[in-house]
Amino acid sequence: MYTYLMVIMLFCIGVVVTLTSVPMISKMLEKSDMIRANYKGDMIPVGLGLVFIPTLIINSVILIYSNIVPEKIIMIYMLLFASISMSFVGIIDDSLGNRGVTGLLGHFKALFKGTLTTGAFKALLGGFVGLTIAVTISKSIPNIIVATLVVALSTNMMNLFDLRPGRAIKVYTLLAIIIFIASAKFQREVMMLILPAVLAYFYFDLRALTMMGDAGSNVLGVSLGVFIVSSFGLA
């Protein structure tokens, strides 16, 4: 049953878990030489988007335990699957990515020449994740096509915004608020699985203390896509 208490509880837990996770994951990445120069030339840890995953999992356990409706539980698992998958491919790109190939077109040109770049791998996996989400929520071919594109393009959009500290999170938060207001009650609870982590991490990103990398921007984009297709009649 929807209650404002559940939303508040998930929000508070998400903030606490994220603030606890940031220093630990930051230190882990530093020890693994996951360090990169930011736009000012300062060397900071990259891949801090991983901090979104602990909050997502913990809050998902709570929300799944409190619900017995299969359709609602499926929605939670969709977000879990999409976010963990794209965070996984994101951290691969952050750690192994070839910066000599840029842009979606550049990655696919390399792919057509027989070279699989991490960027192309990310784009392909994003497309298949979008397709998986789409066929889960709809059996209508037109809706499946639209939903797949929404999820895939949302992921790519957040990558494009994540070029300066705080920019991607600002855009994400604005769009998430709009979706939150327009969504049904349970969708709002689902949004609380990830939104608190994003807001709690915002300070570190805005101050350029850490870089969330593709491990984070992918999660922002794909979660936004899941929220859109599950909230606006694409089933």
Enumerate the predicted regions with their spans:
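"…together with the soluble PPM/PP2C metallo-phosphatase catalytic core" -> "…together
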Residues: 2-235
